[in-house]
Amino acid sequence: MDLKFTVSGRIAKSVDVVYEAVADPAQLSKYFTTGGAKGRIETGATVTWDFHDFPGAFPVRILAVEKNRRIELRWGAAPGTADADESGEPSTKVTLEFEQLDDGRTLVKISEEGWAQRPEGLAASYKNCEGWTGMLCAMKAWLEYGVQFRQGFYK
């Protein structure tokens, strides 16, 4: 059985507003990357996400983008927790999907896969599942109400 997960949530904004809140580093830094994001999400780019509550900045490789529909990325994982990518480093693949709903809201789905089939991979997948769920909640609070609540949430 592959270790992977999908989380989802609905945000009361149009798909272009929600997509841009992820693709634009200035917006992403308002509710998710507490240490800042550098680089716009575009196919082939490597951007940087930094979190005050986790050590160091993370390089994030953008594999594919379909504006207002999908973002596919790969980022590093701790040794022993994920399968190796083409460079030989442990990493997982994340897919964010955006769907405009008939009532004007946007459904966002986030899936992550590539975890190693061992206890360390399972534990790491649970932590990231928690993190992506928190990201969706923080994005909803930011876009719908202008509230930033991630700062200090994890540490």
Predicted segments — roles?
Residues 51, 75, 110-112:
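Residue-level recognition of conserved beta-strand positions in structured domain cores
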Residues 81-133:
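Beta-strand/loop substructures that line and gate deep hydrophobic ligand-binding cavities in soluble
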Residues 1-15:
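Terminal, regulation- and interaction-focused segments at domain boundaries
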Residues 9, 59-64, 92-100:
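Hydrophobic/aromatic beta-strand elements that line small-molecule binding cavities or substrate pockets
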Residues 6-7, 17, 26-61, 68-70, ...:
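Short beta-edge strand/loop motif at the mouth of beta-sheet-based domains
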Residues 141-155:
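Short, highly charged C-terminal tails/helix-capping segments
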Residues 69-77:
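Short, solvent-exposed secondary-structure boundary/capping segments
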